[in-house]
Amino acid sequence: MRRFTRMTRTLAAGAALSMLAVACGGDNGTTDADGDAAGSIAEDYDLDGLEVRVASKDFAEQLILGQLAKVAMEAAGAEVEITENLPSPDGARNALLAGDADVAWEYTGTAWTNYLGNDEPIDDPIEQWEAVARDDLAENGVFWTEPAPFDNTYGFAYPNDLVDERGVETVTDLAEFVEANPGEATLCVDSTFASRDDGLPRIEEVYDFEWDRDLMFESDFGVIYTSVVDQDPCIFAEVFTTDGSIVAEDLFLIEDDQNGFISYLSSVQMMEDFANDNPQLAELFQEITADIDEATMTALNAEVDVDGEFPEDVAENYLREQGFIG
């Protein structure tokens, strides 16, 4: 395994995200002079008098999801405070467990392995969510809402304009390419992917091949994306499947045709008592994310990471376009 660095593109999102810390809700631009909110949320939900604290991790997707929850609850009349940029993977989770937050988005794969201590993933994404929801409630008193449709798991990618030439469309194809081209199949990865149980070792087990670690170059994701676009020093890259850079850099996402990667569905976590006291919240969060599939989430992420939009603006625009707010 080799570590490498390279000057990468500077995105306007960097400056935007650095300005985000703690923001308090109350005025989301969806109320008229009399305080009456517009849109379907205001018609269907009543959260007047409810005070809610939202916690979000430190990357675009989490910031967008947190803002979606905040804007939606405010449209229903709640007063919302949001704390953002908590460190991954467990900053928001720790805030929830400590009583410093009421609502936090989390991923089933993270909970299954990191919080619940399981080594073997469950292949079916919904069955894994059901197991996480059951065990986290029993062990820690944490309630999980039904998940959004998108799955932000690991993946492999390379430039779209090389697909016809290289012929790698599935991970089965990729495994065959690696074995047929010893010494050529270089891969850019983050610091843990090549060794963590739910990363490359699981893919090698499921697809029955071995990838030479000497062909791997380790760096952060900003450098990973520019490197695979340049095809130097790697011709394939580890990615997250809803990363906006996949669209921005015109990368082809290789299909995980044997479901080798563990699922990372996203749900809202709430402590059991808070969830029971506020049953409208689970329904609200499910409704506003019901149409957010991988393509939609990737596009929203790109608005922040590539276009430099603020997460709160991206979230508000999405809810308005869907008719949830006026």
Residue ranges of model-derived segments:
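Sec-dependent bacterial lipoprotein signal peptides
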Residues: 1-22
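Bacterial lipoprotein signal-peptidase II cleavage site
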Residues: 23-37
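Short, well-ordered beta-strand elements
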Residues: 48-61, 79-84, 183-188
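Short, polar/charged alpha-helical segment
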Residues: 60-79, 197, 204-205
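Ligand-binding "clamshell"
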Residues: 115-125, 130-145, 231-234, 245-258
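A conserved helix-loop-strand patch within extracytoplasmic ligand-binding domains
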Residues: 126-186, 290-294
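A bilobed periplasmic-binding-protein/Venus flytrap-type ligand-binding module shared by bacterial periplasmic
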Residues: 154-164, 264-278
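Ligand-binding pocket segment of bilobal, Venus flytrap-like solute-binding proteins
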Residues: 180-256
